[in-house]
Amino acid sequence: MIIYVHTAGRPHRQTTIKSFSADLMKRTRLVVQDAEKDKYNIAPLKDNLVVLPPHINRLSPTRQWILENTETDKFVMMDDDLTFAHRGPYTKTKLYQANPQDVEQMFSELEYLLDT
């Protein structure tokens, strides 16, 4: 499963991928507009870049392009400003900030569900 994080105008504020483990980053693609590709040529982002064609500069066409050009049949599209939380083991109401291992577990469970 590939994780696509579409982003624009925030090369130094990547909230979503800050929650990802190194293993999860290997499956993540940061989708950027052609006009901004040089701004995202920074570690750790530069190794995961997917640059859109120059005529695509809005969110809806970006999502459509990802859908039509993905490398796999299982993928997730996410915004670049997400935070993650989970419920604690002894409460059904309190939320706890998720660490990278929690987020990786979430994606593992999602992939398992997509396979069943």
Protein language model annotation of sequence segments:
Residues I3-L24, E36-P44:
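Short, well-formed alpha-helical segments that are part of the catalytic scaffolds
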Residues Q14-S19, L95-Y112:
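Well-ordered, non-membrane alpha-helical segments in soluble/globular domains
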Residues V31-M78, T83-V103:
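Active-site-proximal specificity loops/subdomain of glycosyltransferases
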Residues A22-R29, P44-V50, S108-T116:
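Structural alpha-beta junctions
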Residues I2-Y4, R29-V31:
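A structural signal for isolated positions on well-ordered beta-strands in alpha/beta enzyme cores
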